[in-house]
UniProtKB/Swiss-Prot annotation:
Pathway: Amino-acid biosynthesis; L-histidine biosynthesis; L-histidine from 5-phospho-alpha-D-ribose 1-diphosphate: step 5/9
Function: IGPS catalyzes the conversion of PRFAR and glutamine to IGP, AICAR and glutamate. The HisH subunit catalyzes the hydrolysis of glutamine to glutamate and ammonia as part of the synthesis of IGP and AICAR. The resulting ammonia molecule is channeled to the active site of HisF.
Active site feature: C80 (nucleophile), H186, E188
Enzyme Commission number(s): 4.3.2.10, 3.5.1.2
Gene3D superfamilies recorded: 3.40.50.880
Domain spans labelled Glutamine amidotransferase type-1: 5-204
Name the record gives this protein: Imidazole glycerol phosphate synthase subunit HisH
SUPFAM superfamilies for the chain: Class I glutamine amidotransferase-like (SSF52317)
Primary location class: cytoplasm
Complexes and interactors: Heterodimer of HisH and HisF.
Subcellular location: Cytoplasm
Length: 204
């Protein structure tokens, strides 16, 4: 149904236009907001993010969004850094205790620098993913479909993983923790399969 209340959370640390256009192309109207009433009244929410986890968490705190995101009961999709923020912590600044970035803690995932061997970082470009069977986020998406990635840090594979990818090491390409979903890739930049994934999320 295209009359859903769809909200992109205005974190201040992402370029929301490409995500907005991808949703609008599917026939949905989109609101960009950080207003608690608007966010909590949404049927579906998107949490995009670019940049660093430390800057993103700082922005979320300054905008009083940390607790608000944790109160969301409807499906929420974190994209790229937005997915990483759903995890417990990020080591993007280093592995020492005073360098660890605390994230939202909505799943147990920990974000660490990808160990890629001779492969270049960032992991940038098209790669295939391996979804688990039966998750509705990947309904009617062909096996071995390519999605577009741009990242140097990844979340380890865990119980929350609903799709994995391999780039020197396996990492979580998509996760689900209750009503919270996340994708490390950019569905809004992943052609028809990316559009299908966004449609699947909106139809949950």
């Amino acid at each position: 149904m295209t009359n859903q209340n769809v909200v992109i959370i205005d974190t201040g640390c992402s370029n929301v236009s490409s995500v907005r256009f991808a949703i609008e192309r599917l026939g949905y109207e989109v609101t960009i907001s950080r207003d608690p009433q608007v966010v909590l009244a949404a049927d579906k929410l998107f949490l995009p993010g670019v940049g660093t986890a430390s800057e993103a968490m700082k922005n979320l705190a300054e905008r009083d969004l940390i607790e608000l995101v944790k109160q969301v009961e409807k499906p929420l999709l974190g994209i790229c850094l937005g997915m990483q923020l759903l995890g417990k912590l990020s080591e993007e600044k280093g592995q020492k205790a005073d360098q660890i970035v605390d994230c939202l803690g909505l799943c147990d995932g920990e974000v660490r620098k990808l160990q890629t061997g001779d492969l270049p970082l960032p992991h940038m470009g098209w790669n295939t993913i391996k979804p688990v069977e039966g998750n509705p986020l990947f309904k009617d998406i062909p096996e071995n479909s390519y999605f577009y990635f741009v990242h140097s840090f990844g979340m380890q594979v865990g119980d929350y993983t609903i799709a994995s990818c391999d780039y020197g090491q396996p990492f979580t390409a998509a996760l689900q923790a209750g009503n919270y979903y996340g994708v490390q890739f950019h569905p809004e930049r992943s052609s028809k399969v990316g559009s299908k994934l966004i449609q699947n999320f909106l139809e949950l």
